[in-house]
Regions:
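Eukaryotic helix-grip
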Residues: 1-283
Length: 283
């Protein structure tokens, strides 16, 4: 991939369940059940406001979450370890309250940031998302997704029906997403994300897309596509899944040659780890 911040990996696997069952499993899968994936919290969203993120106060008291708290408490002076807009950086207000792994002022700050970004996404799609403020300039999530798709012609062609009918292709899209958020580990520091899951029937199968349109760390933007085809395994209905993961991240921009190949291999290992966990739950 010529896009310096982009990376793409592909994988395929069989789910021993009919397509509709597999689709439901993908839509409702909860990775927090698998400690090796290091997803600490995950919750559905309806856009009701900051209160939807109050479960941040129940985060585990591990070193990853502690690093996330410490990075937040350095705002607004030092935003270097978080991905925020220039306006968001200024919103943090230090205060008292230390119950739980994430203190109340930190919970309040992130609840506001996530709620505002969620509201913007629901009303305007990717184009409404504020740019990340970085040392090298502003990073716009919509432009990151467009660059990833441009460099992935096979995925862009295969998933064109889904892309054109969702926020991935611009605007709000005509297909309504399932919205959710997560708290997860990124190389020793926890991060929060906002995501939208889309699904659409195509032919005798289904296509899905899991769009990460905001991440406080780990990625600028990402999308995981799944093509689901009905197949038979030993006379039983099953699903053949082709998965394509496209990721834009700051850590990728300086990698070249062997280092970039190594990063691709590492990403594939993480994807395979997630697939194995999913297949265990799908039995």
């Amino acid at each position: 991939m010529r896009f310096s911040r982009g990376l793409s990996v592909e994988s395929a696997f069989i789910v021993r369940a009919p397509v509709k069952t597999t689709l439901g499993l993908l839509q409702n899968w909860n990775p927090t059940r698998h400690s090796e994936l290091k997803v600490y919290l995950s919750g559905d969203l309806s856009g009701r406001g900051p209160g939807e993120f109050q479960s941040l106060s129940t985060a585990p008291g591990n070193s990853s979450v502690k690093a996330f708290v410490e990075a937040t408490e350095k705002l607004p002076g030092d935003p270097s370890k978080l991905q925020l807009s220039a306006a968001e950086v200024k919103e943090f207000a230090p205060g008292s309250g230390s119950e739980g792994a994430i203190p109340a002022p930190v919970v309040t700050f992130w609840s506001q940031v996530l709620s505002q970004r969620l509201k913007s996404f629901v009303s305007g799609g990717l184009s409404s998302q504020p740019a990340y403020q970085t040392a090298g300039g502003n990073i716009v999530p919509e432009e990151e997704i467009a660059a990833l798709l441009k460099e992935s012609p096979s995925a862009r062609s295969q998933f064109a029906p889904l892309i054109s009918s969702t926020a991935i292709g611009g605007g709000r899209g005509s297909v309504s997403p399932n919205l959710y958020w997560q708290l997860f580990d990124v190389e020793g520091q926890a991060a929060v994300s906002l995501n939208a899951f889309y699904a659409r029937p195509v032919g005798d199968g289904w296509q899905t897309a899991d769009l990460g349109y905001y991440g406080s760390g780990g990625f600028y933007a990402l999308v995981s596509f799944h093509q689901l085809w009905p197949v038979q395994v030993n006379g039983t209905d099953a699903t053949l899944v082709w998965r394509v993961d496209l990721t834009s991240a700051s850590a990728l921009s300086e990698l070249r040659g062997v280092e970039r190949l190594g990063s691709g291999a590492a990403m594939m290992r993480e994807v395979q780890k997630g697939i194995k966990a999913f297949l265990r739950d799908a039995r």
